[in-house]
Amino acid sequence: VFDQNGNPVRVTLVQHFESNCYKVHLSDLMTISGNGALNFLLETPKYRIRALEHKGKREFKRPLVLLALSELINKPLKYKGNKLFFSIPTCKPLKFPHQDLPVPPFIFGFWFKNRLRANIFSIKDLNYKEVIQKFKDHGYEITKTVKRKGRATIFSVYPTIESQLIPFIPNQIPNNYLLASEEQRIELLSGIINAKINQYKKPRDHFRIASTNWNEIRQIQSLVESIGCKTSLHYRDYIKYYTLSFKSRYKLCENQESPPIRIHQTRRYITEIENIATQQCVHIETDGPDGSFLVNEGFITCR
Protein backbone atom coordinates (compact mmCIF):
# COMPACT_ATOMS: atom_id res chain seq x y z
CA VAL A 1 0.00 0.00 0.00
CA PHE A 2 1.00 3.68 -0.10
CA ASP A 3 1.40 6.21 2.73
CA GLN A 4 0.39 9.90 2.83
CA ASN A 5 3.65 10.88 1.09
CA GLY A 6 2.96 8.52 -1.81
CA ASN A 7 5.69 6.07 -0.76
CA PRO A 8 5.04 2.30 -1.01
CA VAL A 9 4.99 0.64 2.43
CA ARG A 10 4.75 -3.03 3.40
CA VAL A 11 1.70 -4.38 5.26
CA THR A 12 2.94 -6.11 8.42
CA LEU A 13 -0.36 -7.12 10.04
CA VAL A 14 -3.96 -7.75 8.92
CA GLN A 15 -6.70 -8.73 11.40
CA HIS A 16 -10.42 -9.29 10.72
CA PHE A 17 -13.06 -8.59 13.37
CA GLU A 18 -16.60 -7.25 13.82
CA SER A 19 -17.25 -3.89 15.45
CA ASN A 20 -19.69 -1.01 15.73
CA CYS A 21 -18.85 1.38 12.92
CA TYR A 22 -19.22 4.95 11.71
CA LYS A 23 -19.46 6.51 8.28
CA VAL A 24 -17.48 9.72 7.67
CA HIS A 25 -18.92 12.01 4.98
CA LEU A 26 -16.51 14.30 3.12
CA SER A 27 -17.09 17.55 1.24
CA ASP A 28 -16.62 15.94 -2.21
CA LEU A 29 -19.34 13.34 -1.39
CA MET A 30 -16.84 10.54 -0.72
CA THR A 31 -17.29 8.44 2.42
CA ILE A 32 -15.06 6.31 4.66
CA SER A 33 -16.40 3.66 7.02
CA GLY A 34 -14.57 2.30 10.05
CA ASN A 35 -14.76 1.62 13.76
CA GLY A 36 -13.77 4.00 16.56
CA ALA A 37 -10.09 3.03 16.32
CA LEU A 38 -9.74 4.38 12.76
CA ASN A 39 -7.35 7.35 12.86
CA PHE A 40 -7.14 10.41 10.61
CA LEU A 41 -4.34 12.94 10.16
CA LEU A 42 -6.32 16.19 10.20
CA GLU A 43 -5.96 19.89 9.52
CA THR A 44 -7.55 22.42 11.87
CA PRO A 45 -8.40 26.08 11.10
CA LYS A 46 -5.09 27.16 12.67
CA TYR A 47 -3.17 24.70 10.49
CA ARG A 48 -4.90 25.95 7.33
CA ILE A 49 -4.15 29.59 8.22
CA ARG A 50 -0.46 28.78 8.69
CA ALA A 51 -0.41 26.79 5.45
CA LEU A 52 -1.95 29.76 3.61
CA GLU A 53 0.68 32.11 5.07
CA HIS A 54 3.55 29.75 4.25
CA LYS A 55 5.70 31.19 1.45
CA GLY A 56 7.81 28.11 0.81
CA LYS A 57 11.05 29.81 1.90
CA ARG A 58 11.66 27.18 4.58
CA GLU A 59 10.27 23.78 5.55
CA PHE A 60 6.68 23.74 6.82
CA LYS A 61 6.90 21.93 10.18
CA ARG A 62 3.44 22.29 11.72
CA PRO A 63 2.17 18.73 12.36
CA LEU A 64 -1.24 17.41 11.42
CA VAL A 65 -3.58 16.48 14.29
CA LEU A 66 -3.98 12.73 14.85
CA LEU A 67 -7.53 11.86 15.98
CA ALA A 68 -9.42 8.58 16.21
CA LEU A 69 -13.04 8.34 15.09
CA SER A 70 -14.03 7.63 18.70
CA GLU A 71 -12.65 11.10 19.58
CA LEU A 72 -14.00 12.85 16.49
CA ILE A 73 -17.62 11.92 17.18
CA ASN A 74 -17.48 13.95 20.40
CA LYS A 75 -16.07 17.07 18.76
CA PRO A 76 -17.99 19.80 16.88
CA LEU A 77 -17.47 19.60 13.12
CA LYS A 78 -18.36 23.26 12.57
CA TYR A 79 -17.25 26.58 14.04
CA LYS A 80 -18.11 30.26 13.60
CA GLY A 81 -21.53 29.42 12.30
CA ASN A 82 -21.30 27.12 9.31
CA LYS A 83 -17.54 26.75 8.71
CA LEU A 84 -16.19 23.19 8.69
CA PHE A 85 -13.52 22.56 11.33
CA PHE A 86 -11.59 19.43 10.28
CA SER A 87 -10.10 18.63 6.88
CA ILE A 88 -8.00 15.81 5.42
CA PRO A 89 -5.20 16.92 3.07
CA THR A 90 -4.78 15.13 -0.23
CA CYS A 91 -1.86 12.74 -0.44
CA LYS A 92 1.33 13.41 -2.32
CA PRO A 93 1.75 11.78 -5.77
CA LEU A 94 2.01 7.99 -5.64
CA LYS A 95 5.57 6.88 -6.30
CA PHE A 96 5.35 4.23 -9.02
CA PRO A 97 8.52 3.12 -10.87
CA HIS A 98 9.46 4.55 -14.28
CA GLN A 99 7.90 2.59 -17.15
CA ASP A 100 9.35 1.82 -20.59
CA LEU A 101 6.41 2.96 -22.74
CA PRO A 102 5.93 2.41 -26.52
CA VAL A 103 4.70 6.01 -27.01
CA PRO A 104 5.83 8.97 -24.85
CA PRO A 105 3.13 9.80 -22.24
CA PHE A 106 2.30 13.31 -23.54
CA ILE A 107 2.00 12.02 -27.12
CA PHE A 108 -0.19 9.09 -26.05
CA GLY A 109 -2.49 11.33 -24.00
CA PHE A 110 -2.86 13.77 -26.90
CA TRP A 111 -3.52 10.92 -29.36
CA PHE A 112 -5.99 9.24 -27.01
CA LYS A 113 -8.29 12.30 -26.70
CA ASN A 114 -7.63 14.12 -29.99
CA ARG A 115 -7.46 11.69 -32.91
CA LEU A 116 -10.14 12.28 -35.53
CA ARG A 117 -9.19 9.10 -37.39
CA ALA A 118 -5.92 7.23 -37.98
CA ASN A 119 -3.01 9.74 -37.87
CA ILE A 120 -5.22 12.82 -38.21
CA PHE A 121 -5.11 15.41 -35.40
CA SER A 122 -6.61 18.88 -34.95
CA ILE A 123 -5.24 21.71 -32.83
CA LYS A 124 -6.18 25.31 -32.01
CA ASP A 125 -3.78 28.25 -32.39
CA LEU A 126 -3.64 28.76 -28.61
CA ASN A 127 -1.41 25.73 -27.99
CA TYR A 128 -0.26 24.94 -31.55
CA LYS A 129 3.43 25.79 -31.01
CA GLU A 130 3.67 23.92 -27.71
CA VAL A 131 2.11 20.70 -29.02
CA ILE A 132 4.01 20.66 -32.33
CA GLN A 133 7.27 21.21 -30.44
CA LYS A 134 6.43 18.30 -28.12
CA PHE A 135 6.02 15.99 -31.12
CA LYS A 136 9.31 17.20 -32.62
CA ASP A 137 11.15 16.83 -29.29
CA HIS A 138 10.11 13.17 -29.20
CA GLY A 139 11.40 12.51 -32.72
CA TYR A 140 8.18 12.79 -34.73
CA GLU A 141 8.10 14.43 -38.14
CA ILE A 142 5.12 16.64 -39.00
CA THR A 143 4.20 15.25 -42.43
CA LYS A 144 1.08 17.21 -43.29
CA THR A 145 -0.36 20.49 -42.04
CA VAL A 146 -3.58 22.11 -43.18
CA LYS A 147 -4.14 25.54 -41.67
CA ARG A 148 -7.68 26.88 -41.80
CA LYS A 149 -8.19 30.54 -40.96
CA GLY A 150 -10.18 30.96 -37.76
CA ARG A 151 -10.44 27.21 -37.30
CA ALA A 152 -8.32 24.33 -36.01
CA THR A 153 -5.17 23.22 -37.83
CA ILE A 154 -5.13 19.62 -39.10
CA PHE A 155 -1.83 17.71 -39.02
CA SER A 156 -0.30 14.23 -39.31
CA VAL A 157 2.95 12.75 -37.99
CA TYR A 158 5.55 10.12 -38.86
CA PRO A 159 5.94 7.51 -37.52
CA THR A 160 2.25 7.12 -36.83
CA ILE A 161 1.14 6.52 -33.25
CA GLU A 162 -0.86 3.49 -34.35
CA SER A 163 2.25 1.82 -35.84
CA GLN A 164 4.01 2.10 -32.47
CA LEU A 165 1.07 0.56 -30.60
CA ILE A 166 0.63 -2.48 -32.88
CA PRO A 167 -0.57 -5.22 -32.41
CA PHE A 168 -3.09 -3.80 -29.91
CA ILE A 169 -4.58 -0.35 -30.55
CA PRO A 170 -6.09 0.51 -27.13
CA ASN A 171 -9.53 2.04 -26.72
CA GLN A 172 -8.75 2.87 -23.09
CA ILE A 173 -5.62 3.99 -21.22
CA PRO A 174 -3.35 0.95 -20.65
CA ASN A 175 -2.36 0.14 -17.06
CA ASN A 176 1.36 0.65 -17.74
CA TYR A 177 0.59 4.35 -18.38
CA LEU A 178 -1.58 4.69 -15.27
CA LEU A 179 1.09 2.95 -13.15
CA ALA A 180 4.02 4.95 -14.56
CA SER A 181 6.23 7.35 -12.59
CA GLU A 182 4.96 10.68 -11.25
CA GLU A 183 6.62 12.65 -14.08
CA GLN A 184 5.20 10.29 -16.73
CA ARG A 185 1.66 10.52 -15.31
CA ILE A 186 1.82 14.33 -15.23
CA GLU A 187 2.97 14.28 -18.88
CA LEU A 188 0.12 11.89 -19.75
CA LEU A 189 -2.42 14.21 -18.13
CA SER A 190 -0.85 17.21 -19.89
CA GLY A 191 -1.32 15.45 -23.23
CA ILE A 192 -4.99 14.76 -22.44
CA ILE A 193 -5.54 18.41 -21.46
CA ASN A 194 -3.78 19.79 -24.55
CA ALA A 195 -5.83 17.53 -26.82
CA LYS A 196 -8.80 19.87 -26.27
CA ILE A 197 -7.53 23.21 -25.05
CA ASN A 198 -10.93 24.48 -23.83
CA GLN A 199 -10.67 21.94 -20.99
CA TYR A 200 -8.80 24.59 -18.95
CA LYS A 201 -10.96 27.42 -17.58
CA LYS A 202 -8.57 30.30 -16.92
CA PRO A 203 -10.89 32.64 -14.92
CA ARG A 204 -11.47 29.93 -12.28
CA ASP A 205 -8.09 28.22 -12.74
CA HIS A 206 -9.63 24.76 -13.02
CA PHE A 207 -9.82 21.90 -15.51
CA ARG A 208 -12.95 20.22 -16.82
CA ILE A 209 -12.91 17.03 -18.89
CA ALA A 210 -16.11 15.66 -20.43
CA SER A 211 -16.80 12.18 -21.81
CA THR A 212 -19.74 9.90 -22.56
CA ASN A 213 -17.57 6.88 -21.70
CA TRP A 214 -17.78 5.88 -18.01
CA ASN A 215 -14.64 3.70 -18.05
CA GLU A 216 -12.60 6.42 -19.73
CA ILE A 217 -13.63 9.18 -17.31
CA ARG A 218 -12.96 6.90 -14.30
CA GLN A 219 -9.48 6.14 -15.63
CA ILE A 220 -8.72 9.84 -16.00
CA GLN A 221 -10.13 10.50 -12.51
CA SER A 222 -7.82 7.84 -11.05
CA LEU A 223 -4.89 9.38 -12.94
CA VAL A 224 -5.63 12.85 -11.53
CA GLU A 225 -6.13 11.57 -7.96
CA SER A 226 -2.86 9.61 -8.14
CA ILE A 227 -0.84 12.84 -8.51
CA GLY A 228 -2.46 14.37 -5.41
CA CYS A 229 -5.35 16.37 -6.91
CA LYS A 230 -8.92 16.25 -5.59
CA THR A 231 -11.59 15.69 -8.26
CA SER A 232 -15.32 16.16 -8.65
CA LEU A 233 -17.28 13.89 -11.00
CA HIS A 234 -20.83 14.63 -12.19
CA TYR A 235 -23.25 13.09 -14.68
CA ARG A 236 -25.28 15.48 -16.84
CA ASP A 237 -28.42 13.47 -17.51
CA TYR A 238 -29.95 15.89 -20.00
CA ILE A 239 -26.92 15.71 -22.31
CA LYS A 240 -25.76 12.20 -21.36
CA TYR A 241 -22.12 12.80 -20.43
CA TYR A 242 -19.81 12.80 -17.42
CA THR A 243 -17.88 15.88 -16.31
CA LEU A 244 -14.65 15.60 -14.30
CA SER A 245 -13.47 18.82 -12.62
CA PHE A 246 -10.25 19.48 -10.71
CA LYS A 247 -7.55 22.03 -9.95
CA SER A 248 -3.85 21.35 -10.41
CA ARG A 249 -0.80 23.42 -9.62
CA TYR A 250 1.28 21.29 -11.95
CA LYS A 251 1.80 23.04 -15.29
CA LEU A 252 -0.44 21.10 -17.66
CA CYS A 253 -0.95 23.61 -20.51
CA GLU A 254 0.68 26.77 -21.82
CA ASN A 255 -2.06 29.23 -20.83
CA GLN A 256 -2.40 27.89 -17.26
CA GLU A 257 -1.87 30.36 -14.43
CA SER A 258 -1.70 28.54 -11.08
CA PRO A 259 0.25 29.33 -7.89
CA PRO A 260 3.14 26.99 -7.06
CA ILE A 261 2.71 23.98 -4.74
CA ARG A 262 4.04 24.77 -1.28
CA ILE A 263 2.55 22.10 0.98
CA HIS A 264 -0.06 19.99 -0.82
CA GLN A 265 -2.64 20.38 -3.57
CA THR A 266 -5.92 20.63 -1.69
CA ARG A 267 -8.09 19.08 1.04
CA ARG A 268 -11.41 17.39 1.82
CA TYR A 269 -13.54 18.64 4.73
CA ILE A 270 -15.39 16.34 7.13
CA THR A 271 -19.07 17.27 6.88
CA GLU A 272 -20.80 14.56 8.95
CA ILE A 273 -20.17 11.41 10.99
CA GLU A 274 -23.01 8.91 11.40
CA ASN A 275 -23.44 5.62 13.26
CA ILE A 276 -23.92 2.56 11.05
CA ALA A 277 -24.60 -1.11 11.76
CA THR A 278 -21.96 -3.51 13.06
CA GLN A 279 -19.71 -4.56 10.20
CA GLN A 280 -16.74 -6.75 9.38
CA CYS A 281 -13.60 -4.62 9.86
CA VAL A 282 -9.98 -5.04 8.84
CA HIS A 283 -7.14 -3.81 11.07
CA ILE A 284 -4.02 -2.96 9.02
CA GLU A 285 -0.52 -2.11 10.18
CA THR A 286 2.39 -1.09 7.94
CA ASP A 287 6.14 -0.62 8.32
CA GLY A 288 5.94 3.04 7.23
CA PRO A 289 7.41 5.76 9.48
CA ASP A 290 3.99 7.24 10.37
CA GLY A 291 1.81 4.12 9.93
CA SER A 292 -0.47 5.88 7.42
CA PHE A 293 -2.03 4.23 4.35
CA LEU A 294 -4.36 5.35 1.57
CA VAL A 295 -7.93 4.08 1.12
CA ASN A 296 -10.85 4.46 -1.30
CA GLU A 297 -10.94 5.98 -4.76
CA GLY A 298 -9.66 9.35 -3.59
CA PHE A 299 -6.49 7.90 -1.99
CA ILE A 300 -7.55 9.28 1.41
CA THR A 301 -5.03 9.07 4.27
CA CYS A 302 -5.94 6.90 7.28
CA ARG A 303 -4.08 5.17 10.08
Residue ranges and their predicted role:
Residues 3-7, 12-243, 268-303:
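Intein-associated homing endonuclease modules of the LAGLIDADG/DOD-type, together
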Residues 250-277:
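Surface-exposed, non-catalytic interaction/assembly patches
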